[in-house]
Amino acid sequence: MRARLPLRWLLPVWLSACAGSAYRVNNEGRLFGRTGNTVWVQGPWEAIQPSRDVDEVIDQLCPAIMKLEGAAANDLGQEYCGAIYSLGEGVYYASHGSPLGKTVPVGSTRRKQCTPPSRVVDARGRTSTLADYHSHPWAPSPLSIFDLKNDNQLWFIRIQFDRGCTVMKYLPYRHAPRPGEVYVRRNGTWILMGLLESDLDKDLGVVTPVEAK
């Protein structure tokens, strides 16, 4: 007969399986969904005030996302992905966050990884996407090689933030003959932290640190 595992051993597994599940069940097909292998998200997200200054939108994202299920649950947590977009009138909006993606191992635990959206749906009109954003449920968490590789870039800007609300920005310049740029948000200012100096660096996600000024 197989021994029964103590409840305290099963609790982390149960939490991992449930992180973000109610949010997904209640909102899939309404606030986010799949079209084939891609993910779409609905906007605007009422929790984020729109602005003509995209940084004002970015600064609201982390506090709002961290209120969602599992968003700050460390290795047992849930990533959320979304987009920043406009309707062509010079005002930027944020979409709802999507938990859709795959579950990946992190050490001895498992984490739910989100897929950046390929499309934003807004009933008011045609959308133009500027950036994708995603959260990490632990801290500190810098941009990874996966986050930086050229093949994984969908838009002009990539925003990432961790559970401590350290916000990173990547300008990939995927089709331009200039370095990719990695920034961190500090006291309302973007500080340059690293460069992806060559096309090969951008393909591989290799960052050369720069001295912060």
Regions found by a protein language model. Give the residues of each.
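Active-site-proximal loop/helix of nucleotide/amide-processing enzymes and allied scaffolds
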Residues: 21-24, 114-213
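Sec-dependent bacterial lipoprotein signal peptides
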Residues: 1-16
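Glycine-rich short-loop/terminal segments
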Residues: 19-123, 201-213
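Intrinsically disordered, low-complexity sequence elements enriched in Ser/Thr/Gly/Pro
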Residues: 2-6, 109, 156, 183-184
